[in-house]
A protein has these predicted regions:
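Nucleic-acid endonuclease domains
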Residues: 1-67, 75-216
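Acidic/His-rich structured neighborhood in mature extracellular/periplasmic domains
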Residues: 71
Length: 216
């Protein structure tokens, strides 16, 4: 079996969404728990690609879904395109999650006998683009304007980035040495990161490192 690469995964995602939109997902009738629906879709995609490719499959509870392509699968409703992911460290908000994301956005419709998952968008976000949009935008502006370490620490403090003085000091040194890439997610502080995808799913392939596809 061929090993799956990123391009293969994108091609399969397009076909997968088309197939899923045509099915009656009876086991999801009346289910409104986004996490359960997401897990169902993620497992279905893992099964779908594993029939054609040699892949390493991860566990959605521990680690990422497709370690062999360094990608985690996210599925979310068009009503509120967001999900959560494990918090590793504050650095993720500035330099990205550390892995790619493959995001499926669906519209769920139920009747007494049917459940339709109408797949609307698929977006692949490279790891370098998974940081927070506003935070990286402002930090990049500050660096362009000649900000120093104290300025950066002040900004991180104002934004209530998780961490203490040592974390802020270390991050500020890194930011001044390595300007963060512009991120395109909205990453909200919580016990887990809350990721919002409203912006990234509608970039229409205008940004390098972000691939967008729509079925409708």
């Amino acid at each position: 079996m061929k090993k799956m690469n990123i391009q293969d995964m994108k091609a399969e995602a397009k076909e997968f969404g088309k197939i899923m939109s045509s099915e009656n997902h009876k086991m999801l009738i009346g289910v409104n728990d986004g996490k359960k629906i997401g897990t169902y879709i993620e497992h279905r995609f893992q099964e779908f690609v594993s029939r054609k490719y040699e892949i390493e499959v991860g566990n959605s509870a521990f680690g990422i879904d497709l370690p062999s392509v360094e990608t985690d699968i996210k599925s979310t409703s068009i009503v509120k395109p967001q999900s959560s992911c494990p918090f590793r460290n504050a650095r993720q908000k500035i330099y990205g999650l550390g892995y790619n994301l493959l995001i499926f956005v669906y519209d769920k419709t139920d009747t007494t006998a049917t459940c339709t998952l109408d797949f609307k968008y698929c977006t692949f976000v490279e790891a370098t683009r998974t940081a927070d949009f506003t935070t990286t935008k402002r930090l990049r502006e500050m660096i362009d304007d000649g900000a120093n370490k104290e300025d950066i620490i002040g900004y991180l403090t104002d934004k209530n980035l998780p961490g203490d003085e040592i974390v802020y000091s270390d991050l500020s040194d890194e930011i001044l040495c390595h300007t963060p890439e512009q991120g395109y997610l909205t990453v909200t502080n919580a016990n887990q990161w809350r990721l919002s995808y409203g912006r990234v799913i509608k970039l229409d392939n205008a940004v390098s490192g972000v691939w967008n596809y729509g079925w409708n």
